[in-house]
């Protein structure tokens, strides 16, 4: 199974590469043209753009000429919010606000938005897009589904998501224990 478990994380220098790297295709499980010219994009994790941005752009660009798009986030545990902005940017025609993040330690609200341009042809605002979610949909994956639904851009289909659309920090406090602390909401 390609599902990531926290026990697989070594929390060392190579952590980001291990979680989001090429060995898991930067979270892109499947890109497919289905019958009736429907595009399918199955994403398992949202990589930092410095690692997986080019792969995300390529995947989205491969589906640009489909008549409808299904984004499968049912097994996506989240990842980097900048990937949310990138994906959302392909699905709208202008800069749009996305959910923000409030930092408790800094007492600072950071607003997120779609990017003013994409490095591929945008999918556009008129073709139907469906986002599949499940209780395994978590963190940044939940944020993408929520943001696009709030913009009226997608139809969300599935179960109630797992939640967790808030950034956190973690510290290894023992070889067998990790402390996860939500720092933003």
Q: Which role fits each region the language model picked out?
A:
Residues 1-35:
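Extended, small/polar residue-biased N-terminal targeting/export presequences
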Residues 25-53:
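STAS-typified acidic loop motif
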Residues 41, 71, 129, 148:
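Terminal peptide-recognition signature
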Residues 43-46, 72-75, 103, 132-136, ...:
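Active-site-proximal beta-strand/loop segments in catalytic clefts of secreted hydrolases
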Residues 49-67:
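A short, well-ordered alpha-helical element
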Residues 66-80:
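Short, glycine-/small-residue-enriched flexible loop/hinge segments at domain edges that mediate gating
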Residues 69, 152-165:
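Short, well-structured beta-strand/strand-turn elements
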Residues 79-132, 166-174, 183:
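Gly/Ser/Thr-rich loop/hinge elements
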């Amino acid at each position: 199974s390609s599902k990531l478990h926290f026990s697989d994380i070594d929390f060392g220098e190579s952590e980001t590469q291990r979680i989001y790297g090429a060995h898991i295709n930067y979270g892109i499980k499947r890109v497919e043209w289905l019958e009736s010219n429907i595009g399918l994009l199955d994403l398992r994790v949202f990589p930092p753009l410095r690692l997986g941005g080019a792969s995300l752009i390529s995947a989205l660009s491969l589906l640009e000429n489909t008549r409808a798009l299904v984004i499968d986030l049912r097994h996506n545990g989240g990842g980097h919010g900048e990937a949310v902005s990138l994906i959302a940017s392909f699905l709208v025609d202008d800069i749009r606000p996305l959910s923000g993040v409030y930092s408790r330690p800094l007492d600072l609200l950071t607003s997120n938005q779609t990017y003013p341009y994409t490095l591929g042809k945008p999918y556009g605002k008129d073709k139907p897009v469906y986002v599949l979610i499940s209780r395994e949909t978590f963190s940044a994956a939940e944020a993408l589904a929520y943001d696009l639904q709030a913009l009226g851009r997608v139809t969300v289909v599935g179960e109630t998501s797992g939640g967790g659309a808030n950034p956190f920090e973690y510290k290894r406090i023992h070889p067998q224990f990790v402390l996860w602390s939500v720092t933003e909401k």
